Amino acid sequence: MKDAVSITMLVAFACGIAGPALGAEQRAIQWTQIPVQNITLFYPGQSTYEWLLSPAHEKGNIRVAAGRPCLNCHEGEEQAIGDKLVKGGPLEPTPIAGKNGTVKLALQAAHDAEYLYLRAQWKTNLKREGRMHDYVRFDGKQWKWYGKDRNDPAVRSGKQPALYEDRFSIMLDDGKVPNFATHGCWVTCHAGMRDTRDQAVGDVVRKHPLLGDAGLKESDVRKYLPSTRIEPGASWDKTKTAEEIAKIKAAGGFLDLMQWRVARSAAVGMADDGYVLEYRNFDAGKNPFGWNLDRKTMTPLYMFDAAKVGVRALRAEDIGIPAKPAAVIRESNAVPFDSSAGWQDGDILPGRLLSRADAKGSAADNDSVQGAWKDGTYTVVWRRKLNTGNDDDKALQVGGKYTVSFAIHDDNVTTRFHHVSFPLTLGVGADADIKAVTVK
């Protein structure tokens, strides 16, 4: 894990497998000189925050309610917890066959006066890169969705292939979110969310005055902080007012959430930028990804430029072949969709459109995240400004100490079917669980 990977080599490799990796240039860091922190991420199942506070947690609920850190009781138990939960039981009613209980993350951190740099490596469960997401397939008459995540009933029944992107996610706080330093990402995970107990989807969410059609225009429930509900333990729908939530945000009571998405951001050298408050929100501006599809008519907007990548569409047998394109990038490998181009039954196009040029605002802050997959291992080098200057990001400073939590979505899964870490401290030139070493 400690081999040196220069940014130049990493970019060149990423270009070879996924089209142009266009991330902003990073400074050369001698990663062989930076200590490696080995972190075990484990499978959490349906262990929501409500479960942590319930008697089912077997006296752990009393300690959680008292604010004691998870690591006080569970340090060194990550492997045992993950291996137990992934097999199925009360906290995992729908286990996925062949899924591993843990992922070993090797993390290094450095900083200079302007940026934080992270280098992450981990092995994947599958023998291919998870760069497939929201694909559509032509059946001879029309374009239809093709592929789902591994928990989807259509995949479990064999009606659809398992096609979903891998992700590496970082949560970050500066001490302003209650209990994140002690309980980590569990403060964001609640009953009612997708793939949890009593999940709320459809009309019940659309009719909600804050989350639904009259507010955020959402149709499901995603991560949120307890501070945005009317009282401790309140259900997902018992939200405070928009004005009250805005005050929490203005006071810094949100979590920074950044995600490197192998399908939706990696090919343009970026990661998305979001935050968790009353919902899992994206930062202001425009992401590096959008839709490559009119979802009402199921008509693609762009196709591959055959003159540049050799094909105008993929076939099922192309998926997972590194030499084949996987992402449609507006400014580099795409041309407008031509409905009269002689499409054949089985032609496949990505339903997402990537563009580095179109990414704007705070949503585009993570503009230099280079990643590659080789021989079953991802290597990601991430650069982030210490202070982005945006009010939906956490501002860092040299000498500061912060709380971080990591998650990895591996093997074509989404939502809670990931691996997570307990909360850790990150020091920018300061002693911590993870110390970002000063580079000149």
Residue ranges and their predicted role:
Residues 105-108, 367-373:
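Beta-strand-rich interaction surfaces with strong enrichment in secreted/lumenal proteins
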Residues 67-77, 189:
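The canonical Cys-X-X-Cys-His
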Residues 365, 372, 380-388:
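A beta-strand/beta-hairpin structural motif
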Residues 24-67, 81-108, 131:
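Sequence context of c-type cytochrome heme-c attachment sites
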Residues 1-9:
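Bacterial N-terminal signal peptides that target proteins for export
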Residues 115-122, 378-384:
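Short, well-ordered beta-strand segments enriched in hydrophobic/aromatic residues
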Residues 24-53, 138-344, 389-440:
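Acidic/polar low-complexity flexible segments
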